[in-house]
């Protein structure tokens, strides 16, 4: 971080000459000097060059107004105002709290001023670094000798082997040196929440508006289990979103709890909807408790917010209405909601604590903020027994955490602190909205078909768009007003083939073809539905990436309209089955898959498959214990009606459990089986289009088997 910007000093000799001297002195201290053309150029520089560490300007020309504009972008940026002895310094005490320092134009003072700028720059870096990261950097710079773990000893061991040296050179020395042992006492402990680790947790809690925050180094899958193990002791009843992440199913397999499922909606596109307001009401819960064997009044509830497709709840309503001691919002996909006003009232940590309740929010820091994979956080509002909670935390946390993951979690919080964090999120929102508008423009100008966007008809400023009962764009039935909102950052592109109400069109392009085309060109889709593709506009998405996606979509249309051969447009798919795809053209492939989907009446089948849940014969915990005792056998998929499932069955997409361990598909819930069979049939007909179904195993003959409990088991 060594870039200093100097604003124009108007060609006045007594001002320019001291600045020339200062330029030379700063270069002698290894600063790089840049000269923005004007105020707008400077502000763009601050937005786009994060290594800028100071601005030098003439007070008479730019004064306090420029300081305020810079502060909106980065309130910690060191500012250096030069003034002559006749300048009017109309600055209040409050203004002086900004990072502005004054110097007088004088020849021969450059060395002293440069030294002060060097000192202020070091203070700036020290000020913006969060506590644990700062302590880790200091430890690495000190280069201490250790006789403890890890065995590679700062990378030294890797360099004793040719292949190890290649590995070392790829990752670099700082990665190696920062991989250290928990025996390093000056860094404190992740498990004991001491020293700089404790300071990091307190820092994160302040940034994320929490009362208590925990860093988790092996993903939100683990964060969810930590919260669940503490909040739902064995023998208790828990309310769980049926569209939960599989980690919540694993929690139910680990702990002997009785689940009662919230029943979310789903539209014709297969987009996961929210849980209706009625599901949170006391009367509905009382009815479910009465209907569920061994159930008692729930002590805990888990809600996925946002949904995979970007739908956020009115969390204020849920906090106020849901009659349980603790509510856990699994917010893995939205770690950024505290940093833009459009998300107020739509996330777990928004607002004040709720009297008599504990609110948890788990977030995958790595998913949409800047952190290493597996970086996750638990935020808490409400009174918990910290010692008992920490037992659950330690149960699921390694005693050898990777400090790079921990520091990246804290650094992600530091990046979101203050105006700079708001600017990052607002930039993501703006890019996503511009992309949406560009898709709509291209659609209106295209000959024939083009892609569409799942969103309201008119989008103007930045907001989360409400799903209303009098609007048709979302495709959901019986929607509650002021309950669900679409996050602009989650962009769902629609392909031709299906109307909003689920009516199948004569012409269609299954989204899986587009996903394969994009993948061949280095663009990875987050989620692919039958006729929709999900793209996440995280803070790492810039204009170049957005334009590359637009270009790829228009190139797909061109290639599709030319009806190119599959082997030319999708060479990787062709290589999977050259004989099958030898003479096939892209339009033939698209129409054949479309007709197969139409034959199964996919929209109606999806509605029916999720309308009636399989029967819960036993809890997931009991089913898993029986599997551990070997009381299972495999049957073909079509034979599972009337059998108790041993494992969860989870098709991807959308990646949420369809059948839970201990559940049985009955005649009433047979559409669940028919939906799974349709997914398998597409893969059987068209090589390369097999659906990944967790819990179903493809055999050599192409048929799928599942694990069920033996019929004589009790």
Curated annotation (Swiss-Prot):
GO annotation, cellular component aspect: cytosol
> Where in this protein does the record say N6-(pyridoxal phosphate)lysine is found?
367
State the similarity comment: Belongs to the Orn/Lys/Arg decarboxylase class-I family.
Annotated compartments: Cytoplasm
Spell out the coiled coil positions from the record. none
> What assembly does the database describe for this protein?
Homodecamer. Interacts with RavA.
| Enzyme class, spelled out | lyase
MF-aspect GO terms: arginine decarboxylase activity; lysine decarboxylase activity; pyridoxal phosphate binding
So which cofactors does this thing need?
Answer: pyridoxal 5'-phosphate
Which catalytic reaction applies to this protein?
L-lysine + H(+) = cadaverine + CO2
For this protein, the record's PROSITE patterns field holds: OKR_DC_1
Name of the protein this chain belongs to: Inducible lysine decarboxylase
Entry's EC annotation: 4.1.1.18
Q: Name one Pfam family in it.
A: OKR_DC_1
NCBIfam families found in the cross-reference section: PRK15399.1, PRK15400.1
Record keywords: Cytoplasm, Decarboxylase, Lyase, Pyridoxal phosphate
Name the gene for this chain: cadA
Q: What is its main location?
A: cytoplasm
Check the record and name the InterPro entries matching this protein.
Answer: OKR_de-COase_N (IPR005308), Orn/lys/arg_de-COase (IPR011193), Orn/Lys/Arg_deCO2ase_major_dom (IPR000310), Prn/Lys/Arg_de-COase_C (IPR008286), Prn/Lys/Arg_de-COase_C_sf (IPR036633), PyrdxlP-dep_Trfase (IPR015424), PyrdxlP-dep_Trfase_major (IPR015421), PyrdxlP-dep_Trfase_small (IPR015422)
Spell out the PANTHER family in the cross-references.
Answer: BIODEGRADATIVE ARGININE DECARBOXYLASE, CONSTITUTIVE ORNITHINE DECARBOXYLASE
Q: Which organism is it from?
A: Salmonella typhi
